[in-house]
Design a protein with these regions (language model features):
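Sec-dependent bacterial lipoprotein signal peptides
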Residues: 1-5
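Acidic, low-complexity intrinsically disordered segments
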Residues: 7-150
């Protein structure tokens, strides 16, 4: 007996912003990737590092329309662990145009001098100040700092 089975190829759905195609990692992404914020309401947007290797620091520079959105709060993520003693976290704001600069550095511990994997860099609480559309974009100054090991 011979059995012949037919099947249809499954298309992958990348609705989850953390599902980054393998040829585009490492990556820094927003989650959720699209959000509607009602006027005078707030919404939390997370910034994630996806499939990074040997990272010791991150600079995420994010632009937005400050006529439409206001940043209410920025909280440290867990990429470098829950213990704030192992990391430094700085946030700077520039109002015109709306820019947030997040610097997040890993100080290391007895087990490791860098971090690999996927994790949250920060959570940003935005408030809708006016009706309109605002993009959130990473600038070209967004970068990963990698562990340097000198050749032996």
């Amino acid at each position: 007996m011979i059995f012949i089975l037919a099947c249809q190829a499954t298309e992958l759905d990348y609705d989850n912003p953390l599902d980054v195609p393998s040829d585009e990692v490492p990556a820094i992404v927003f989650e959720p990737s699209i959000e509607q914020i009602p006027l005078l309401s707030s919404s939390l947007i997370n910034v994630f590092a996806v499939e990074v290797e040997n990272v010791t620091g991150i600079r995420a520079e994010i632009t937005y329309d400050n006529n439409i959105l206001q940043v209410s709060d920025v909280a440290r993520g867990d990429l470098f662990g829950q213990n704030s003693q192992n990391s430094l976290f700085f946030v700077n704001f520039q109002d015109n145009p709306g820019t947030i600069v997040i610097d997040y550095f890993y100080l290391g511990n007895s087990e490791s001098q860098s971090v690999s994997g996927t994790g949250k860099i920060a959570s940003i609480l935005f408030k809708g100040n006016a009706v309109g559309v605002s993009g959130l974009e990473f600038t070209s100054k967004t970068e990963l700092c990698l562990l340097y090991t000198s050749p032996s």
